[in-house]
Amino acid sequence: MYTVTSADGTKIAYDRYGEGPAVILVGGALGYRKFKVMEQIAAGLSEHCTVINYDRRGRGDSGPAGPASVEREVEDLAALIETVNGRASLWGYSSGSAVALRAAAAGLSVEKLALYEAPFKTDPDAKFPRDDYATRLELLIAADDRMGAAKHFLRNVGMPGTMVAVMSLVPMFKRFGANGHTLMFDYLALGDQNMHGSPLRAEEWASVSCPTLVVYGSKTYPSLKHASRSLADALPNATLRELPGQKHAVKPSAIVPVIGEFVAGATVVA
């Protein structure tokens, strides 16, 4: 494990793998770098890339989250990019895609963006998240109810209440639930203006000029397919790709070759 100090003094923990073009993995809501899937993706890419797999602030071995802020997460990525000679591609998973987008929009030295199923709510027929999601989430975080915040999140991605109750009994959920206080970072990165069933606006993303690959699974939720298409339409330099047979929980064996080819121009076998 390595650490780098972000602009506000927060220590950001990361693991480094391999040699080649640099790619930083930006995990989604509740995730952390030691989650098995993230480690498998990092290992799979390491044959052809220098891979940085990090704990977003407030998670895992990184320092405390502090008040939710897009700017702080962008600063964290800026510090990580400096560890790989000042330029890197970013791979974002789910809401991590929004963090990666904000970093590119802010002018960081981002070579390429590969984004998997950023969960913007662009479909007017989508039921989740509910319009009061952020308000309730803020209250739970203010009360330091991390598990409550995590359960609230799961209900607002469409998980039935009975399944949420069962999930909360699974030991692994405790690790995810411990990151419940960071969920507002994800929501702010997505942007409240992008979470109420309207198309994404091109002007919001006009400064994201780097080559961008927007990927979604053929078996994912219709709302995530809709969001991926809307994102590709809004970005100035994007390619849209459907990944056959994949759901939102993408398999490393399916996504690693896609990232490797896009970032490094290499044929990668996961």
What are these regions (language model features)?
Residues 87-124:
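Conserved hydrolase catalytic core segment
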Residues 175-233, 242, 250-252:
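Conserved serine/cysteine hydrolase catalytic core
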Residues 236-270:
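Catalytic active-site module of serine/aspartate enzymes centered on a nucleophile-bearing elbow/loop
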Residues 43, 52-89:
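Active-site loop/oxyanion-hole signature of alpha/beta-hydrolase fold enzymes
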Residues 35-37, 62-67, 125-126, 225-226:
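Conserved catalytic-core motifs of eukaryotic protein kinase domains, centered on the activation segment
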Residues 55-59, 119, 244-246:
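Short beta-to-alpha linker loops that shape the active-site pocket of alpha/beta-hydrolase fold enzymes
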Residues 118, 122-177, 186-194:
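Helix-rich cap/lid subdomain of alpha/beta-hydrolase
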